[in-house]
């Protein structure tokens, strides 16, 4: 457990939005990632966040040395890094989408396996049933010199229960590296992503970092850094978004209560909080039991326990259910 008196009061975070390479060119991501680490460190960043599956391996060979090179760069520039890759699962042709947290000594501190992959049955369908993305079964927080990091991946940010649990475990910032899609249609959900990032930050009184790969054909990214009070940084094009996270202000927001501002408004404008302070204390867990009850239409993330070939039946069931609604 980190003693908050020993934490740095501020930390500069760099969220990277790279022009990502896939397939036969995926090997190029490693050198590019190291260059981004240099750029971020030169800008004063202490923590660099890459997107889901970046620098890999993700779509190419499962061992390409990318993670080793990123660890070396993290050690050389004395920065923490969130990197992404695909890891082999326990069964043949199974994989985990993994968020790897590296400290400033270049050592891997955590390997978070995405607990809610984006419809693993759909992934199996798209890959002809040859490859299966399996879910992890553990949520993770990691203590760093600048605060406690809650690890997520991509659209898990849209699942409020995950963010709330990480907050209850003491997370100061939630880091959700995103994947990305090909083509211009993704721009339609860019603002939705940023709205969700701000919402998770405000409702949990945490900082939120989102990143995205820009694949060939991508038009706009969704990379952003949000505080409980406002959007601190965002980027549409390739590059880095940088923001300073203030832990002292975060502690002040968490320790105060909303009514204080109503009854006695602060004299200085900069002391007026742009969120609902004390929000994390306003909870009625005795009313939340339905959240953990089995639901008939809930997605079966562990269909592989019934046999990997059952993905077809699971997919058909979901598709038919969607048509019925």
What spans do the regions from the language model cover?
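Acidic/histidine-rich helix-loop elements
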Residues: 19-28, 124-128
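Short beta-strand segments enriched in small/hydrophobic residues
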Residues: 4-20
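Short amphipathic alpha-helices and their capping/turn segments at secondary-structure boundaries
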Residues: 1-5, 31-44, 161-167
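Short loop/turn motifs at secondary-structure junctions
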Residues: 12, 43-44, 148, 170
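Cys-nucleophile CN-hydrolase/nitrilase-fold catalytic domain and related Cys-dependent amidase chemistry
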Residues: 23-113, 181-199, 203
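Active-site catalytic loop in hydrolytic enzyme cores
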Residues: 90-177, 181-199, 219, 259
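CN hydrolase (nitrilase-like) catalytic-core segments centered on the catalytic cysteine
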Residues: 63-83, 148, 154-242
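C-terminal beta-strand edge segments of enzyme domains
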Residues: 131-132, 203-206, 212-325
